[in-house]
């Protein structure tokens, strides 16, 4: 590892600053116990940046991210800023420009249901009795969200609107390579999601994915149409390892996978570019309704930090130790409100303390 690893810390809005404080506890242990040399610099983003500087992504924040090796992101948004035009609101005016600026073409969303938390899943107990571990890999910078032309118009027949789904072969190839590489260190299965029976873009998607798969003979490739995939995830989620998806399909199916785990407060995410520069954030939102109550689940933020350690710093053993510390905390029965019975639960800061203690003690 380089002499000093620079992390831009962007707590943001809502519960973002609260759960980020718990991630700092882990970062302190990484410096003290594992001798990592970290340079942590905090910047405003989202609603708080609008309040202070009039813009969701200030130039100072963008420059700070450019001078960093990775971004640890909290959350942005809230009703307070709903009066703004959509394009100026925290979510639209901060995250999307960051993804575009750093060419973060891949989004990794783990959806893991631990056996000791299977009661949280809305699925039948016989379906989730062994838990599941799915990694959704979503192409993030192409497809219908960014394709042109798009627009909304009126003519003599009425009002109409249109969007364009477009993918280049190189966009599909690079996301497919990432999926197969990651599958090689997991259970060696990739299921590619498309709609190749009706969409030309999906026909190309399937062709390129098949082509890339030839370079990974040890990884089993399968294909599902998006509608069937959504059904199969409900019917038997344990059959899946990695789901490889286009932008819009990944947007939909990763939320479905998150929901069947029972708590989005447990789920991290990573958005990466070709240089493994990444933006790491909880999969959930800013949850302004519980802001300041010390009841938010910090696990997604801590696991997002673990993903940063794994993918941008390439320190898998240390990332494994963080993941194990979370595992031990849950195994011992510690629960925040969102994953509790509603009566017996601990506070945000207490969960952070417990996970940090397990990491520090090296259990």
Curated annotation (Swiss-Prot):
A single MF term (Gene Ontology) = 3-isopropylmalate dehydrogenase activity
**Swiss-Prot/TrEMBL site (Important for catalysis) positions:** 145, 195
| Residue numbers binding substrate | 99, 109, 138, 227
Which reaction equations make up its catalytic activity?
A: (2R,3S)-3-isopropylmalate + NAD(+) = 4-methyl-2-oxopentanoate + CO2 + NADH
**Under which main EC class is this enzyme filed?**
oxidoreductase
Q: Which NCBIfam families match?
A: leuB (TIGR00169)
Protein name stated in the entry: 3-isopropylmalate dehydrogenase
Q: Which gene name belongs to this protein?
A: leuB
């Amino acid at each position: 590892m380089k002499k000093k690893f620079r992390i831009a810390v962007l707590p943001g809005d809502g519960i973002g600053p609260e759960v980020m404080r718990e991630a700092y506890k882990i970062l302190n242990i990484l410096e003290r116990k594992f001798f990592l040399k970290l340079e942590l610099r905090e910047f405003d983003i989202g609603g708080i940046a609008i309040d202070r500087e009039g813009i969701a992504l200030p130039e100072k924040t963008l420059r700070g991210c450019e001078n960093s090796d990775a971004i640890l992101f909290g959350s942005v948004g809230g009703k307070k800023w709903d009066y703004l035009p959509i394009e100026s609101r925290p979510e639209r005016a901060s995250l999307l420009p960051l993804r575009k600026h750093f060419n973060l073409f891949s989004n990794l969303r783990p959806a893991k249901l631990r056996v000791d938390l299977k009661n949280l899943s809305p699925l039948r107990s016989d379906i989730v009795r062994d838990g599941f571990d799915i990694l959704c890999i979503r192409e993030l910078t192409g497809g219908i969200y960014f394709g042109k032309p798009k627009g909304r118009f009126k003519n003599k027949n009425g009002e109409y609107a249109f969007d364009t789904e477009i993918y280049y072969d190189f966009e599909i190839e690079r996301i497919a390579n990432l999926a197969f590489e990651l599958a090689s260190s997991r259970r060696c299965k990739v299921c590619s999601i498309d709609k190749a029976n009706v969409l030309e873009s999906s026909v190309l998607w399937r062709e390129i994915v098949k082509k890339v798969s030839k370079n990974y003979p040890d990884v089993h490739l399968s294909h599902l149409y998006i509608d069937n995939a959504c059904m199969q995830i409900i019917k038997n989620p344990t059959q899946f390892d990695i789901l490889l998806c286009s932008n819009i399909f990944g947007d939909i199916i990763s939320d479905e996978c998150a929901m069947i785990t029972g708590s989005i407060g447990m789920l991290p995410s990573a958005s990466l570019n070709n240089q493994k520069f990444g933006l790491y954030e909880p999969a959930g939102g800013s949850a302004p309704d519980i802001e300041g109550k010390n009841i938010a689940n910090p696990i997604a933020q801590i696991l997002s930090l673990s993903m940063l350690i794994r993918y941008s710093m390439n320190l898998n053993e240390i990332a494994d130790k963080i993941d194990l510390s979370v595992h031990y905390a849950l195994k011992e029965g510690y629960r925040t409100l969102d994953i509790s019975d509603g009566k017996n639960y601990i506070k945000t800061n207490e969960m952070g303390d417990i996970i940090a203690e397990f990491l520090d003690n090296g259990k």
